[in-house]
UniProtKB/Swiss-Prot annotation:
Protein's GO biological process: DNA recombination; regulation of DNA recombination
Record-level Gene Ontology MF annotations: double-stranded DNA binding
Main location as per UniProt: cytoplasm
Superkingdom: Bacteria
PANTHER family on file: RECOMBINATION-ASSOCIATED PROTEIN RDGC (PTHR38103:SF1)
Keyword tags: Cytoplasm, DNA recombination
Cell compartment(s), UniProt: Cytoplasm, Nucleoid
A single GO cellular-component term on record: bacterial nucleoid
HAMAP family attached to this UniProt entry: RdgC
Lineage, broadest ranks: Bacteria, Pseudomonadati, Pseudomonadota, Betaproteobacteria, Burkholderiales
UniProt-recorded name of the protein: Recombination-associated protein RdgC
InterPro entries per record: RdgC
Described function: May be involved in recombination.
Protein family membership: Belongs to the RdgC family.
Length: 299
């Protein structure tokens, strides 16, 4: 249930539609399986099997954007197109021109699409309207951009902006390592990436490796800056902070898992309990992380 990544956003103005209102808006852009000739289809799906498009617990909302894509390798299309082109050349006595090759490739694609396999990818969105957070569970910026585009399309107007802080993650993370002191409530873990600002982009990575403060300071003195840092918040949640203010590798620690054990009687109750706990913990983490980065900067 827990999100593994957080692409963090803020509401720039109060946003408090009811779950029913959000449901009605998403329903206009709901997911439907694509036809045999569609390369990709996208729409909102239920976070739970056959449930509503907006899963709510209290004021917390959970959404799911589903993407279905046909797997049709370019190499296969090109191979069949070349074979067809050779047949045409033999028939007409000369090679097909550029326009004819383009039309032939489109024809081959249409013929192969119905036989192509489909894969589905779900990307989840957590909305905390009371505290003004919206987070997308996506590691890559491109996937987050897709979700944002669909959110703006379905929930217009949506006063959504990226989280802005007063101190850049790179400057803050480098400062913490140079001073061998994590911000209050956080500890530094054994995964670090230091990168040079020079054209070479020389990079040093520590993965599950004991950290030597003097060694880190030497790298920083040589001009390297921290672009990736593993941390733990209040002994409850571990994560990796990136230079782009993306929170990755989010994982609840044992103390949270122990609290969750035995509190639910069935799968639905367990899902809601996990979602409630995740929302509460991540909201607290984001507040403290924002403060550690100098506080929120209003755009």
């Amino acid at each position: 249930m827990w999100f593994k990544n957080l692409q963090v956003h803020r509401f720039s103005a109060p946003w408090s539609p009811s779950a029913d209102e959000v449901e009605a808006s998403l329903a206009k852009h709901a997911f439907f399986p694509g036809t045999s000739l569609e390369m990709q289809t996208q729409g909102w799906a239920s976070p739970r099997d056959n449930g509503p498009l907006v899963h709510t617990v209290g004021r917390q909302m959970l959404l799911t954007l589903r993407t279905e894509k046909k797997l049709l390798p370019t190499t296969v299309v090109n191979q069949v197109t070349r074979a067809r082109a050779a047949e045409i050349e033999e028939q007409q006595g000369y090679k097909p021109g550029r326009k004819q090759m383009k039309e032939l490739k489109e024809q081959v694609t249409e013929e192969l699409l119905p036989r192509a396999f489909s894969i589905r990818r779900d990307t989840r969105v957590w909305i905390d309207p009371d505290n003004g957070w919206l987070a997308i569970d996506a590691a890559a910026a491109a996937k987050a951009d897709e979700v944002r585009g669909m959110l703006f399309k379905a929930l217009d107007p949506l006063p959504l902006i990226n989280l802005h802080v007063n101190q850049s993650p790179v400057a803050a993370m480098t400062e913490w390592l140079a001073g061998d002191a994590a911000p209050a409530g956080f500890t530094v873990d054994q995964e670090i990436e230091l990168q040079s600002g020079a054209e070479s982009k020389a990079t040093v990575r520590y993965v599950r490796h004991p950290l030597d403060p003097e060694d880190l300071r030497r790298h920083i003195a040589a001009g390297k800056r921290c672009t990736r840092l593993a941390m733990t918040w209040n002994d409850r949640v571990s994560f990796v902070l990136t230079d782009g203010l993306v929170v990755k590798k989010v994982a609840p620690l044992d103390v949270i898992k122990e609290q969750a054990d035995g509190t639910a009687h069935d799968e639905d109750e367990r899902f809601d309990a996990d979602f409630t706990m995740m929302a509460g913990e991540l909201s607290g983490l984001l507040v403290d992380l924002t403060e550690a980065l100098g506080g929120e900067r209003k755009a």
